[in-house]
Amino acid sequence: MFRRTILLLLFSLSTGFASLKVPATDLVFRDRLWFYGQSDVPFTGVAFSISKETGNIIQQTNYIDGLAWGKYYEWWPDGAKKVNGTYRYGLMFGRWKFFFENGKILCAGSYMSGKGHKPTKGIDEIPQDGISGLWTYWDKEGRKVEEGYYTKNGIEKGNWAFWDIDGKKRLGIKIDHETFKNSIARKH
């Protein structure tokens, strides 16, 4: 019984340290790793940011051995989802979703070794570095407006699908951010 109690106590202490939660402003970036304050040990735990306006948590990042690793969350000051995704080795990896302030989804797609998402006041720019695979975009009302593939190098591949104002699917080639060969398709 005594031995089981000691093991349980040691397990509780070890998991307690592993789940350290600190304000993101207390982390220091040096030598390509994140550290808590003046510690020489790379940070393992959860860092969060709080809205000065509402007091709500607006960002949460998991770290292992000084690298962002695992789930990443970001919320608008009112608590609505803003961004969620996953980090691996400190880089954006796997499926990410970005949301408008009204809670409707803006876009969803995947990353392979993306450099990372920096919190912003708005969703002005979706990080392009490391973008890969199928990406889908919606407008503020929740209507799908664009869908297509990126190569592993982040280059748009093939024809993209666009939805016109009437909701009809059109195929076309994107010329630039605002121009398409299919002129009746609309851009998000």
Predicted regions and their residues:
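Short, Lys/Arg-enriched, disordered terminal segments
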Residues: 1-5, 188
